[in-house]
Structures are given as C-alpha cells and as structure tokens.
Amino acid sequence: MARADKATAVADIAEQFKEATATLITEYRGLTVANLAELRRSLSGAATYSVAKNTLVKRAASEAGIEGLDELFAGPTAIAFVTGEPVDAAKAIKTFAKEHKALVIKGGYMDGRALSVAEVERIADLESREVLLAKLAGAMKGNLAKAAGLFNAPASQVARLAAALQEKKAAEGPAEAPQPATEPPAEAPEAPADAE
C-alpha cells in the first residue's frame, strides 16, 4: 500500500472512530468471505464492519484520541463501528459469535473508555432502547392510573358519605329545634368536720 493510500486509510478510519457511538473489536480468523458478508447483513445499519491492518487502526485510533485499545489490535482484527444503538450491534455480534465459533469478541470502546469482553457481552444482553422505553412508559401509565384513583377516591367517598347522611336525615323526619341546655344548681361547699 502506497504511503498516500495509508494516510487516506488512517484518516478514514479515524473519522469512523470519531463518528461512532461505540466500537466493537473482533478477531475473525477462520471466517470465510461469505461469513463476513452474513455478519455485515446481520448488523443491518446498526454498524459498519471493517477489516483493516492493525498498524493503520492503531494510528487511526491515536489520531481520534482513543486510548487503551492497542493490545486488542493483534491478529486478524475487524471492527464494528456502531452508528446506531450499541445494544443492537453487540447483540448481533454476540449471536453471530455463538453460531460461528471462529468469531471472537476481543473488546470495544464506548463513552470514552475501553470495554472488556464481559462488558461487551453485558451490553449485548441488555434490551433495546425501544423496549426499555416501552416498559418505562407502561410502568408510568400504571402508576399514573393508580395515582388518579387515589386522588379521586377521597372526593367520591365524601360524596357518598354526604348522600348517606342526607338520606338518613330525610328518613328521620324533621328535626326538633334544640332546647337550651340547663345548668345544674351549684352544690354548697361542705363544712369542715373539725369545727366545734
């Protein structure tokens, strides 16, 4: 590869690093071209899957300000530059790796830090953003309905009590005017028993 071509390739890869929301790094030793094409299709717009020379990728990562990945760039390395949801891309790669043992997840990079294999797999095990938002909305809707019921309950209870009291008074008939209370006569104080 000519020096100018290498510089262009490094600039292109660096730009992909900068634009990606996450990168997932894999080893593809033993996969066929057909397997790689199948993996690219399974990513379906969530990421672009690229194979490049490790030296060029290291330089591009350095230019993009990404650190901590150099040890992952050994052997036949391919990178998924995630532009959509990291969960979707990680899930697709993990599923493909289960079906094709030749694909090995080496790690990744997201939110300014390197990811271990375990962290990439945990991301893959998460539910997608849409599912999580739907669950949150469902939980909020249920809680709002309960809150509305709680706020309406006291008012309806007071209304039922008022109606019951009104019916009871109507059944008793007209009430007599209250009589003024009479005070009992004051008692005379007792004389002391010692007086003689």
Swiss-Prot record:
**What are the protein's UniProt keywords?**
Ribonucleoprotein, Ribosomal protein, RNA-binding, rRNA-binding
Pfam families attached to this UniProt entry: Ribosomal_L10
Q: Name one GO cellular component term.
A: large ribosomal subunit
Under Gene Ontology molecular function, one entry of this record is: large ribosomal subunit rRNA binding
Keyword Metal-binding on entry: no
Residue ranges annotated as coiled coil are: none
- Look up the record and give one Gene Ontology term from the biological process aspect: translation
Which parts of the sequence are annotated with region: Disordered?
A: 167-196
- The cysteines covalently paired via disulfide bonds are none
Q: Which PROSITE patterns match?
A: RIBOSOMAL_L10
Listed InterPro entries: Ribosomal_uL10, Ribosomal_uL10-like_sf, Ribosomal_uL10_bac, Ribosomal_uL10_bac_type, Ribosomal_uL10_CS_bac
Q: What does this protein do?
A: Forms part of the ribosomal stalk, playing a central role in the interaction of the ribosome with GTP-bound translation factors.
Known partners and oligomeric status: Part of the ribosomal stalk of the 50S ribosomal subunit. The N-terminus interacts with L11 and the large rRNA to form the base of the stalk. The C-terminus forms an elongated spine to which L12 dimers bind in a sequential fashion forming a multimeric L10(L12)X complex.
- Report the family membership: Belongs to the universal ribosomal protein uL10 family.
Instruction: State the NCBIfam families in the record.
Output: PRK00099.1-1
Name of this protein? Large ribosomal subunit protein uL10
Question: To which species is this protein native?
Answer: Mycolicibacterium paratuberculosis (strain ATCC BAA-968 / K-10)
Q: Which gene encodes it?
A: rplJ
